[in-house]
Amino acid sequence: MAKKSAINRDLKRRKLTAKYAAKRAKLKAATMDEALSMEDRFQAQLKLAELPRNSSKTRIHNRCEITGRSKAYYRKLRMSRIALRDLASRGQIPGMVKSSW
C-alpha cells in the first residue's frame, strides 16, 4: 500500500490539471501561433510559466485506485497487476477467469 500522502498528492495534481486545462491549452496555442507577433507569443509564454507547476499533465503519475501502487499499472482498468489478480481470483471482476489449457 502506498503512502496516503502520495495518493493525495496525485489526486491534487489531477484536480489542478482539470482546472487549468482550458487555460493552458489556450496559452499553448498562442505561443505556437505564427500569426501573432513575437511580443504576444512571448507574453503568452510568460503567462504559461506563471501557472502552477502541478497543473501540467506530465506531472500526473498513474496509480492504482485500490492500493496506490505506481508500478505495473493497467491503464484500462486503472489498477495494478496485484490488485487485478486479487480481485480476479475472488471472482469480483465479471468475465475474468483463471486460464487453463
UniProtKB/Swiss-Prot annotation:
GO cellular component: cytoplasm; small ribosomal subunit
Keyword vocabulary terms for this entry: Ribonucleoprotein, Ribosomal protein, RNA-binding, rRNA-binding
One example of a Gene Ontology biological process annotation: translation
A molecular-function term among this protein's GO annotations: rRNA binding
PROSITE patterns attached to this UniProt entry: RIBOSOMAL_S14
Keyword RNA-binding: yes
SUPFAM superfamilies, sorted: Glucocorticoid receptor-like (DNA-binding domain)
Subunit and interaction comment: Part of the 30S ribosomal subunit. Contacts proteins S3 and S10.
Primary role: Binds 16S rRNA, required for the assembly of 30S particles and may also be responsible for determining the conformation of the 16S rRNA at the A site.
Family as reported in the entry's similarity comment: Belongs to the universal ribosomal protein uS14 family.
Protein name per UniProt: Small ribosomal subunit protein uS14
Species, as recorded: Parvibaculum lavamentivorans (strain DS-1 / DSM 13023 / NCIMB 13966)
Organism placement in taxonomy: Bacteria, Pseudomonadati, Pseudomonadota, Alphaproteobacteria, Hyphomicrobiales
Gene that encodes the chain: rpsN
